[in-house]
Amino acid sequence: MAERHDEVRILAFVPIEMQGRLRQQLAPLGVVIDFINNSRELSRIALSHGSYQVALMPAELPDNGWWTLWSQVTLLHPRPEVLVYAHTASFQLWSGVLEVGGHDVIVEPFTDEEIQGAVLRAARSFEQRCSNDKGNE
């Protein structure tokens, strides 16, 4: 599954204890991952690091943090494709993520192949959307 692509940039909102494993799982793809721990870091990193093709975020955050993070991610230009990860995925979660513009839901723990495939599909979708947007200008 380790198919290399031109520098796919990922913005990952994942707990510190998950970051090393995720970096290891995605290393064969040659991606660049910027980890953030809160929405303040998102503002700072997005301004200084350019655009991202993929954003990875959890399905649940305390105190409506998910909606705060979601609203900030959707304001990035160009908007990255959002992969939401969860311990379990119901139809309600999956359809809710798609309804608000997310790309997909992936269930953790995910295998190397699952996370690599999800990232590559999201990055392809991002590139197609950007190409279509340029064609419509």
Residue ranges of model-derived segments:
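C-terminal output helix
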Residues: 110-119
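Short alpha-helical segment
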Residues: 39-45
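Alpha4 helix (beta4-alpha4-beta5 surface) of REC/receiver domains from two-component response regulators
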Residues: 68, 86-104
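Two-component/phosphorelay signaling modules centered on CheY-like receiver
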Residues: 16-37
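CheY-like receiver
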Residues: 2, 7, 124-137
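Conserved phosphotransfer microenvironments
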Residues: 19, 43, 52-79
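Conserved phosphotransfer active-site motifs of two-component signaling proteins
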Residues: 17, 61, 88-92
